[in-house]
Amino acid sequence: MVVDLKQEIMADPRNASFTARGLEPIYMIAPTVKILIIGQAPGAVVEQTGILFNDKSGDRLREWMGIDRTTFYDSGLIGVLPMDFYFPGKGKRGDLPPRKFVAGEWHQRLLDTMPDVELILLVGKYAQQHYLPIKASESLTSVVHRFADFGPRYLPLAHPSPLNNIWLAKNPWFETDVVPALQKRVADILKK
């Protein structure tokens, strides 16, 4: 079924330019996934390597989660489902946002192949706005600060990018409140 979905995604006319360049949709799923990370679209480097979070952002995310690279990539217990499966391109102020149809059309069908998901980490505003009952005007800071309101299934996070160092410095509660709660939840799920 997962292979069929991948072929459907590649055959979607809206993805034709990516498929024509030999690019496959980028996500990391398995029927055994217990913790799913839903984040932004892959960047240009990920488009070339096909490996999600294989950078400083990934190092920080794994640190926040309290897990190592082997658990992240090889255990079959961690999945990653971006808000777009392809790099959407560069804009005037950074990467373009994920294309809106991707999550609406494909996420639930892919989620249905992972029946054991207990925790979904929503990394960044696009994922949070899609999955949480929040107002479009609510800031990422406010949503992440209210992380306990969305449990136990969802846990909103800031993006772990080094570009967010200023945000992290301005919001020390993230490291003192959110990260320990995240690490405990992840550890509890993984030891089952």
Question: Where are the regions a protein language model picked out?
Answer:
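A polyanion-binding, active-site-adjacent surface
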Residues: 1-144, 148-189
